[in-house]
Amino acid sequence: MKLDKSRKLYAEALNLMPGGVSSPVRAFKPHPFYTARGKGSKIYDVDGNAYIDYCMAYGPLVLGHANEVVKNALAEQLERGWLYGTPIELEIEYAKLIQKYFPSMEMLRFVNTGSEATMAALRVARGFTGRDKIVKVEGSFHGAHDAVLVKAGSGATTHGIPNSAGVPADFVKNTLQVPFNDIEALSEILEKNEVAALILEPVMGNSSLILPEKDYLKEVRKVTAENDVLLIFDEVITGFRVSMGGAQEYYGVKPDLTTLGKIAGGGLPIGIFGGRKEIMERVAPSGDVYQAGTFSGNPLSLTAGYATVKFMEENGVIEKVNSLTEKLVSGIADVLEDKKAECEVGSLASMFCIYFGPTPRNYAEALQLNKERFMEFFWRMLENGVFLPPSQYETCFVSFAHTEEDVEKTVEAVSESL
C-alpha cells in the first residue's frame, strides 16, 4: 500500500502541530493517512487508496460521507448566510424534533461540541443542587475538560494519559469514580458523599464497546434517585444511534439531564444539553448558571443536524443500519470461530468492536485487551481496504451508506488480516 504523500505531509505537520494532529487519536503510528475526500461508505486518501470506513468520523456520519440530502440543505443555507448572532427559527423546529425523541429534555440548549455539552451539564447540576462533587465511571469519556479528565477513555487511554497533566488536584478532588456495571460501588460512594450528579455513558464507547449488564441502568436510576443525585446520560455517541431516542429509550431509563452531539450535528460541530425544566431554568439568561457561545445554535450545524434526523425519521435508517450490522458481526464472528482467533466481537445496534481478548465489562478489563495485536490487525485491515478506528479502545460504526458488498469485503478482509 502506497502512503508516500501521507508520510511527507505528516513529517511537515509534526513541525506545526503537537503530534502533527488536531486531535490525539488521529496520530496512530508510524503515521496516519491523509484523507482527500469521502463519499458514501468510503474515504479516499491523498495517495489514491480507497477504504471502506467504519470510523465514520468517530460516529457522527450515520448517513455516510457527503450525503446528498444534507449537502443540499447546507447549500441552501449557505446562500442565506452562515452566522448571524441572532436566534433563528430552525432552533425552535430542531428543539421540538429532539424533544419528540428525547422527552426527558423538557428544555435544551444548543452548544458547539460534546465536551461543551457535558461541561455545561455538570455546571448546571452543581448549580441546581448546590453541591460540588460529581461521580463519573472509570474509563468513560466526556470530553476534554478538567472535571472529567480522570481515568478518561478514548485518546486519553490510547496515548497512556488517562489523567491529564495541567488539571489541578484541588479541582479533580471533587470528581469521584466508580467501575461500570458495579451498582454496589456506586451505592456506597453516593451514600458516603454529598454528590451533585452522576455522569455516565449508558453504553461505554470509548474504552472499547462495553454494554450495561441486565438492569444495571435501572438500578443506577434507582440509587441516584434514592440519594437525591442527578443522573446525567452522556448520549453523545448513543443519541440517534442505539435508537432514535438513544439509550434512554432503548433501555427504558429516564435521566435528569442528557447530552447529545455527533449524529445530532449531521457531521458539523454541535453539542446539546437539556433535561428537566426546573433544572434547565437555572441556565442564563433565565437563571444564575452562566453558559454562552458565539457559535452556539449556528445555522449550518442546525441545518445539517435537522436534515440528518429528518432523513433518519423518514427512511427507517436505524432499522436498516442495524440489520446490516447484524450481518457484518455475524460474518466476523464466524471468521473468528473458524480461525480459532483469540479475540471476540461485540455489538449493539450499529456499533461494534473486535476485542483482542475477552469481552470487557468495565474499564479495568478493557485495559487487559491486547492493544499491540489490535494495531497489527488495524494495519492489515487498512492494507485490505478497510478503515477501522485506530485504537482498541474506540468503537466501530456502520452507516446508512454501507452496502451488502461492503459487508462481504469486510468479512473477507478480517479473514485475511487475521
UniProtKB/Swiss-Prot annotation:
GO terms for molecular function: glutamate-1-semialdehyde 2,1-aminomutase activity; pyridoxal phosphate binding; transaminase activity. GO terms for biological process: protoporphyrinogen IX biosynthetic process. It catalyses: (S)-4-amino-5-oxopentanoate = 5-aminolevulinate. Its cofactor is pyridoxal 5'-phosphate. Keywords: Cytoplasm, Isomerase, Porphyrin biosynthesis, Pyridoxal phosphate. It is found in: Cytoplasm. Its EC number is 5.4.3.8. Transmembrane segments: none annotated. Pfam families: Aminotran_3. GO terms for cellular component: cytoplasm. The modification N6-(pyridoxal phosphate)lysine is found at K262. InterPro entries: 4pyrrol_synth_GluAld_NH2Trfase, Aminotrans_3, Aminotrans_3_PPA_site, PyrdxlP-dep_Trfase, PyrdxlP-dep_Trfase_major, PyrdxlP-dep_Trfase_small. Pathway: Porphyrin-containing compound metabolism; protoporphyrin-IX biosynthesis; 5-aminolevulinate from L-glutamyl-tRNA(Glu): step 2/2. Belongs to the class-III pyridoxal-phosphate-dependent aminotransferase family. HemL subfamily. This is Glutamate-1-semialdehyde 2,1-aminomutase.
